[in-house]
């Protein structure tokens, strides 16, 4: 039991509403420290989590020359300097290479290595996240979160000070409650140091998604659960806790904490309101979880064995030494609400108009007579002009629709095959009939930005924001600026992904 003084100190930190700039004086980790459970890992690409922190939040690497830059808060305790990233990455692509630990323990997160499962990058590593996939504002100031696509993950297998064995710990994360899937496993927290499944109870991490292979909550999900290894748990039962609700706030606070034969799940709208407790009780009723056998590595976006099929968005999170009180966590939630997370535009460059017919012209020298078209389900570039046949003009024309998965972006419906849309499948663009599934909608949603070569637009995949419409050998792909596929070649990338959009031929 925390002394009343500690609880009051934690509350005063968060609720005193003494402000500098846009954020209250105390950060989440100041509040945890006041409550007697200090942060041993503190990760955020959006803001400082200590009032005095002015060091780097994250590192980006740009595609044009491989140079890196650290992005720090605008001021101590403040919001990230997104303008510094925008300037550094102007006219090229950028990836998030390091998410720095603000606790001083050096528990930085970097590209996850292979483990029980291999990632899609060379040598089995996971992908790195786009630096622009998750723009937000905090108190009106722009920042970027970490948009985790399937195959993307970060890890630290040599963390310092994190809980091991049955030692107590707490953790929270601010996530996008609308970005998830049912694959394993979008986690943040404590995992195995070997990147392999070493048995029941060897993890304690926040999970978010609608996976139903192990435990579930009420409704159809998504749920906040705990990945304790060899199971996603919503409570003491390995199967179901009806008290763990489906929850999908755009900004979501997720909390998991555990100590000897006790653990809890809590959650809230990160933009307003207070935390609710969805489970508080004994460890799971099956063997291997009492006592726990935590190993102390840190993961983001993946499972403990590097299962990397999940997706989600991470804005900030911490891990603590000791089991935080509800009062401390309530004060942290008040701080998160005071940060005023809000959405920001996913698009830039020349505007598109929903309902209009467009054609997309290549800008690569030597290919400027070619437009995005289709031959059946194959999407390619073809030479099109005002004197082309009506059939070809229709094949090279697309109706702009509101994004099927995100209304801030767009989907492109065929003019000559109504009901069929451009979508990527295995990163090859194809024309397919809308089957109404969540997966189709996500694969068929694209976000235009100012063209990387200074002309027109580059068309970015919403669910894989490192990937863009690219023509390669006159076939269309969702390509990244460097990668394992031949169509990811860096040569001519900026030209190949830039398109001049005009009124449709048909």
Curated annotation (Swiss-Prot):
Any single GO BP term: arabinan catabolic process
Range of residues in the leader sequence: 1-26
Metabolic or biological pathway, per its Swiss-Prot or TrEMBL entry: Glycan metabolism; L-arabinan degradation
Annotated stretches, region: ABD: 344-506
Binding sites annotated in the UniProt record for substrate: 227, 230, 304, 424, 426-427, 443, 471, 476, 496
Transmembrane segments: none
Keyword check for Thylakoid: no
An example Gene Ontology CC term for this record: extracellular region
InterPro entries: A-L-arabinofuranosidase_B_cat, ABFB, AbfB_ABD, AbfB_ABD_sf, ConA-like_dom_sf
Enzyme Commission number: 3.2.1.55
Site (Cis-peptide bond): 184-185
Keyword Hydrolase (UniProt): yes
Active-site residue list: 229, 305
An example molecular function term from Gene Ontology annotations: alpha-L-arabinofuranosidase activity
Family to which this protein belongs: Belongs to the glycosyl hydrolase 54 family.
The protein, known as: Probable alpha-L-arabinofuranosidase B
Organism of origin: Aspergillus fumigatus (strain ATCC MYA-4609 / CBS 101355 / FGSC A1100 / Af293)
Highest classification ranks of the organism: Eukaryota, Fungi, Dikarya, Ascomycota, Pezizomycotina
């Amino acid at each position: 039991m925390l002394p009343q003084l500690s609880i009051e100190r934690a509350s005063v930190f968060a609720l005193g509403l003494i402000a500098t700039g846009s954020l209250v004086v105390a950060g989440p980790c100041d509040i945890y420290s006041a409550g007697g459970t200090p942060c041993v890992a503190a990760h955020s690409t959006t803001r400082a989590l200590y009032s005095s922190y002015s060091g780097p939040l994250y590192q980006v690497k740009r595609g044009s020359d491989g140079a890196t830059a650290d992005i720090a808060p605008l001021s101590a305790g403040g919001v990230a300097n997104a303008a510094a990233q925008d300037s550094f990455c102007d006219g090229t692509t950028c990836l998030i290479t390091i998410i720095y630990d603000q606790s001083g323990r050096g528990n930085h997160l970097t590209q996850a290595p292979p483990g029980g499962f291999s990632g899609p990058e060379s040598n089995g590593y996971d992908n790195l996240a786009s630096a622009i996939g998750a723009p937000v504002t905090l108190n009106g100031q722009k920042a970027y979160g970490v948009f985790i696509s399937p195959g993307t993950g970060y890890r630290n297998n040599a963390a310092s000070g994190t809980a091991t064995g049955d030692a107590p710990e707490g953790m929270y994360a601010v996530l996008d409650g609308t970005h998830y899937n049912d694959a394993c496993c979008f986690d943040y927290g404590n995992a195995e140091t070997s990147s392999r499944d070493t048995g029941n109870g060897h993890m304690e991490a926040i999970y978010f998604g609608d996976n139903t292979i192990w435990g579930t909550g009420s409704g159809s999900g998504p749920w906040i659960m705990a990945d304790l290894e060899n199971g996603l748990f919503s409570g003491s039962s390995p199967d179901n806790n009806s008290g763990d609700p489906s929850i999908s706030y755009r900004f979501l606070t997720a909390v998991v904490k555990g100590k000897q034969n006790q653990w809890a799940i809590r959650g809230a709208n990160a933009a307003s309101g207070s935390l609710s407790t969805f489970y508080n009780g004994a460890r799971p009723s099956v063997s291997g979880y009492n006592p726990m056998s935590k190993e102390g590595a840190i993961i983001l976006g993946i499972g403990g064995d590097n299962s990397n099929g999940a997706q989600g968005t991470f804005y900030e999170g911490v891990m603590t030494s000791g089991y935080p009180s509800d009062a401390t966590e309530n004060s942290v939630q008040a701080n998160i609400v005071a940060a005023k997370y809000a959405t920001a535009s996913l698009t830039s460059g020349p505007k598109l108009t929903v309902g209009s017919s467009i054609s997309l012209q290549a800008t690569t020298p030597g290919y400027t007579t070619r437009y995005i078209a289709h031959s059946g389900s194959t999407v390619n570039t073809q030479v099109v002009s005002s004197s082309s046949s009506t059939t070809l003009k229709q094949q090279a024309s697309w109706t702009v629709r509101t994004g099927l998965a995100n209304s801030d972006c767009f989907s492109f419906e065929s003019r000559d095959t109504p009901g069929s849309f451009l979508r990527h499948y295995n990163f090859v663009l194809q024309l397919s009939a809308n089957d109404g599934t969540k997966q189709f909608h996500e694969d068929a949603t694209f976000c235009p930005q100012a063209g990387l070569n200074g002309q027109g637009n580059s068309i970015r995949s919403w669910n894989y924001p490192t990937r863009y419409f690219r023509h390669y050998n006159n076939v269309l792909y969702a390509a990244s600026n460097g990668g394992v596929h031949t169509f990811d070649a860096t040569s001519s990338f900026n030209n190949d992904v830039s398109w001049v959009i005009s009124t449709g031929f048909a």
